[in-house]
C-alpha cells in the first residue's frame, strides 16, 4: 500500500516538473518566434532601401532566437546534467523545476520580444543609411542579459537539487 501511494505521488511530481519544463521551453520558444519575426519584418522593409546590408540584418534578426535555445538548455540541464526528471523525483525537486520553468520561460519570452524590437529599430536605421550596426548589437545585449541571468538561476537551482 505504501508503495502505491508513493508511486502515485511520484507521478504527480513528475507531471508537475514536466509542466515546468513545458512552460520553460514553450514560452522561450514563443518569445524567440515573436522576436525574430519582429526583426525579420523590419529587415524586409529595410532591404527595399539598402539591400547591401543583408548580412547585418540577418545577424540582428537571428539575435532574439537565442532565448529559445536557453529554454531548451534549461530542460537539458534538468534532464541530463542534474538527473532530477526521474520516477524518484521528490516534491521539492518538482516544485523547483516548475518554478525554474516559470521564471526562465517568462524572462525569455519578454526579453526575446523586447530584443526583437531593439533589433528592428536598428535594422530600420541601417536601412536608412545610418551606420548603427555595432551600437544596435550593444543595445540588444541588454534584454539578452536578463535571459542569461534566468538561465544561470535555473542552473543554480538545478545544482542545488542535484547536491
Where are these regions (language model features)?
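Single conserved hydrophobic/aromatic residue that forms the stacking wall/gate
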Residues: 1-13
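Membrane-interfacial loop-to-helix junctions in multi-pass transporters
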Residues: 11-19, 52-55, 89-98, 131
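Short alpha-helical packing/oligomerization segments
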Residues: 21, 93-116
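Juxtamembrane helix-loop transition segments at the membrane interface in multi-pass membrane proteins
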Residues: 33-52, 112-132
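Membrane-interface alpha-helices at helix entry/exit sites of multi-pass transporters
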Residues: 52-60, 129-140
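Helix-adjacent hinge/juxtasegments
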Residues: 62-97
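Membrane-embedded alpha-helical segments of transport systems
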Residues: 63-71, 139-151
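Juxtamembrane boundary at the C-terminal end of a transmembrane helix
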Residues: 152-163
Amino acid at each position: 500500500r505504501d508503495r502505491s501511494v508513493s508511486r502515485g505521488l511520484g507521478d504527480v511530481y513528475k507531471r508537475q516538473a514536466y509542466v515546468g519544463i513545458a512552460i520553460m521551453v514553450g514560452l522561450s520558444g514563443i518569445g524567440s518566434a515573436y522576436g525574430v519575426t519582429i526583426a525579420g519584418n523590419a529587415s524586409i522593409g529595410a532591404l527595399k532601401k539598402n539591400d547591401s546590408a543583408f548580412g547585418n540584418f540577418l545577424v540582428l534578426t537571428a539575435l532574439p532566437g537565442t532565448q529559445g535555445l536557453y529554454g531548451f538548455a534549461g530542460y537539458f540541464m534538468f534532464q541530463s546534467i542534474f538527473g532530477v526528471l526521474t520516477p524518484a523525483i521528490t516534491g521539492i525537486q518538482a516544485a523547483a523545476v516548475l518554478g525554474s520553468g516559470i521564471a526562465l520561460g517568462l524572462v525569455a519570452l519578454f526579453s526575446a520580444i523586447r530584443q526583437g524590437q531593439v533589433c528592428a529599430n536598428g535594422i530600420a536605421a541601417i536601412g536608412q543609411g545610418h551606420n548603427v550596426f555595432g551600437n544596435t548589437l550593444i543595445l540588444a545585449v541588454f534584454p539578452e542579459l536578463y535571459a542569461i541571468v534566468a538561465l544561470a538561476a535555473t542552473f543554480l537551482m538545478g545544482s542545488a537539487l542535484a547536491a
